[in-house]
């Protein structure tokens, strides 16, 4: 049985190439070497080659949707950032506490550089210089892989000061949850 999505006319589940999960089949999918070998950070390079407002408009016009249950348009969300308030931050919630949900966990465990690149592009488009990335306490492998990927990205010049020789700088701060007892009390 196939299903269609009202917000993506013409889309039938299962009839498109894998985009988010395309690297999952590789045993070393979480490394910077695999990420770069499969065109990783090309989106960041492309974003930095144009004005931030153009990147924001491109995401908005492409109707890129969030991965949460509401499918909120990313370009719209990025536009909600108050322009007159400083400092501004990107906060990424990797808690994924909905029962039976593993979409974010798999991305963090198997392709953390894709998450980091997305954070960087969002920060660039929205004019942000710091990102806080929260990962649920029970997700030890996700924590390990994201931390290792972030160290690789800093060492390679994808995160930090003057990214890839540009005037754009972003720091990403990782925060681990402590775990939950029943419902987090």
Where are these regions (language model features)?
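Feature of Fe-S/electron-transfer and energy-metabolism proteins
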Residues: 1-185
């Amino acid at each position: 049985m196939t299903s269609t999505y009202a917000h993506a006319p013409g889309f039938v589940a299962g009839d498109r190439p894998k985009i988010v999960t395309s690297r999952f089949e590789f045993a070393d999918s979480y490394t910077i070497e695999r990420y770069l070998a499969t065109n990783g950070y090309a989106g960041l390079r492309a974003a930095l080659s144009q004005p931030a407002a153009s990147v924001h408009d491109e995401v908005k016009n492409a109707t890129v949707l969030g991965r949460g249950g509401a499918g909120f348009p990313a370009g719209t969300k990025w536009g909600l950032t108050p322009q007159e308030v400083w400092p501004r931050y990107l906060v990424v919630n990797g808690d994924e506490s909905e029962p039976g949900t593993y979409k974010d966990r798999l991305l963090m465990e198997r392709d953390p550089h894709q998450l980091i690149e997305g954070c960087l592009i969002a920060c660039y488009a929205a004019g942000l210089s710091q990102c806080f990335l929260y990962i649920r306490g029970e997700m030890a492998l996700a924590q390990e892989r994201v931390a290792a990927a972030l160290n690789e990205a800093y060492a390679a010049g994808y995160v930090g000061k003057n990214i890839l020789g540009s005037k754009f700088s972003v720091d990403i701060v990782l925060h681990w949850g402590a775990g939950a007892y029943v419902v987090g009390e």
